[in-house]
Amino acid sequence: MASIKPLGDRVLVEPRQEAEEKIGSIFVPDTAKEKPQEGKVVEIGSGKYEDGKLIPLEVKVGDTVLYGKYSGTEIKSEGKEYLIIRESDILAVVKK
């Protein structure tokens, strides 16, 4: 698990890892692949303030979420890739 704690209404997401893609005998480089838009919430911020009251986040650690293609900031920690995104950039929680 990452040693990163998001602030405010931000969420730390571990994007779903895509299997290596191969077309015929040619490997598709990471730069040509579509970015995943699904991931697992690994850490959440404390929430956001509205009218002086702290509003907790709706998503929880462990939720699988869908988010916009260009949402968030990509970071690396402990050899893994993560996204820090605002809760408002999360489009849905995937129910299993």
From Swiss-Prot:
Top-level taxon of origin: Bacteria
GO cellular component, one term: cytoplasm
Induction: By heat shock.
GO BP term, pick one: chaperone cofactor-dependent protein refolding
A GO MF term: unfolded protein binding
Main location: cytoplasm
SUPFAM superfamilies in UniProt: GroES-like
Alphabetized Pfam families for the sequence: Cpn10
Gene3D superfamilies per UniProt: GroES chaperonin (2.30.33.40)
Alphabetical UniProt keywords: Chaperone, Cytoplasm, Stress response
Cross-referenced InterPro entries: Chaperonin_GroES, Chaperonin_GroES_sf, Chaprnonin_Cpn10_CS, GroES-like_sf
Task of the protein: Together with the chaperonin GroEL, plays an essential role in assisting protein folding. The GroEL-GroES system forms a nano-cage that allows encapsulation of the non-native substrate proteins and provides a physical environment optimized to promote and accelerate protein folding. GroES binds to the apical surface of the GroEL ring, thereby capping the opening of the GroEL channel.
Assembly mode: Heptamer of 7 subunits arranged in a ring. Interacts with the chaperonin GroEL.
The name this protein goes by in its record: Co-chaperonin GroES
Organism encoding this protein: Leptospira interrogans serogroup Icterohaemorrhagiae serovar copenhageni (strain Fiocruz L1-130)
